[in-house]
A protein has these predicted regions:
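Membrane-interfacial alpha-helical segments at the cytosolic side of multi-pass membrane proteins
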Residues: 113-130, 168-174, 234-248
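Alpha-helical transmembrane segments of multi-pass membrane proteins
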Residues: 61-65, 86-91, 148, 152-159, ...
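Membrane-interface helix-boundary motifs at transmembrane edges
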Residues: 67-78, 134-139
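Short, highly charged, low-complexity non-transmembrane loops/tails of multi-pass membrane proteins
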Residues: 253-274
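Interfacial helix-loop-helix junctions of multi-pass membrane proteins
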Residues: 96-107, 156-239
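Cytoplasmic-side transmembrane-helix entry/capping segments in multi-pass membrane proteins
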Residues: 55, 74-85, 108-111
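Short, Lys/Arg-rich, polar N-terminal cytosolic tail immediately upstream
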Residues: 1-21
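Membrane-interface helix caps and helix-loop-helix hairpins in membrane proteins
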Residues: 43-48, 70-73, 96-106
Length: 277
């Protein structure tokens, strides 16, 4: 009889996971304690939105284990640690500690990582099918790498759609603004003949009689969106290239193995087999 894994994890399952991946458990424990400390601090200061984000992070921390237990997928320790660090860096450091504002390239670093990880995910999905003897499905290394790249870029585009929707519907500022000193637009053409007109050397902008004080024109999200997609592109290209050589020279790509999930080998239930019919 086939047993389906349960969630939350049973004590035996959790102990086995700790023994199998001690580094992952250590990182998980340290980050979880830090998030709990932030949660308590947020509640004391009556910052309930921050407290909600902390609770969300604690749930997301369980996601890798949930996937492994319920879908029969084995995540490499390196990949799992990066996922945990990514969640912490994006939500706790980025949002609550304002790293997105303090460090200008924090967002770009996270989007580059996203491109890399999503390419690894797309690569794994196709590669698992490619190696499954029960499925008549065999693709060349270049096609698998290209599909992984496209998967990563699609996720990146969908995320930008989400950011745009949040900004439009809920007046958020997920697509960060950029101060520029030059703009070009056909709307500035007095002849209305679709001729782009450029204004250079912008040092001040007045809105409804109020000086903004940014030292330039405030671009609304375009530069941020394109930069996010570009660094996502870089991350996707890097992993797709690594994945290509991993398939081409099967078994020699140690770097790729550290990021590619695999199907867990199911062990037969000997107790069920020994039962009399």
């Amino acid at each position: 009889m086939k047993r389906h894994p349960k969630f939350p994890p049973q004590p035996r399952d959790l102990k086995a996971a700790v023994r199998r991946q001690p580094a992952v458990f250590t990182v998980y424990l340290v980050l979880r304690l830090m998030v709990l400390a932030t949660l308590v601090s947020s509640v004391i200061r009556s910052e309930y939105e921050s407290a909600f984000i902390c609770l969300l992070v604690l749930v997301l921390f369980m996601l890798p284990f949930f996937i492994q237990q319920n879908f029969g997928i084995e995540l490499p320790s390196t990949l799992e640690i990066i996922i945990l660090l990514f969640i912490f860096a994006a939500e706790i450091l980025g949002e609550l500690e304002c790293y997105f504002i303090t460090f200008p390239y924090w967002d770009s670093m996270l989007h580059t990582t996203t491109g890399f990880l999503c390419a690894a995910t797309g690569f794994a999905l196709i590669d698992i099918l490619n190696r499954n003897s029960r499925i008549k499905f065999e693709l060349s290394p270049i096609y698998v790498a290209l599909a992984a790249f496209c998967f990563s870029m699609t996720v990146g585009v969908l995320w930008e759609f989400f950011e745009f929707g949040m900004d439009r519907l809920f007046h958020m500022d997920m697509q960060k603004d950029t101060v520029v000193n030059s703009i070009t637009s056909v709307m500035l053409d007095p002849t209305n003949k679709n001729i782009p007109v450029t204004i250079d050397g912008i040092t001040s902008v007045t809105v409804n009689g109020q000086e903004l004080g940014f030292g330039g024109y405030l671009d609304i999200g375009l530069y941020d969106t394109m930069e996010d997609l570009f660094v996502n592109f870089i991350g996707a290209v890097v992993f797709s290239t690594i994945g290509y050589f991993y398939i081409k020279h099967r078994g020699k790509g140690k770097l790729a193995k550290a990021f590619i999930p695999t199907i867990t080998e199911e062990k037969p239930d000997t107790a069920a087999e020994d039962m009399p019919e």
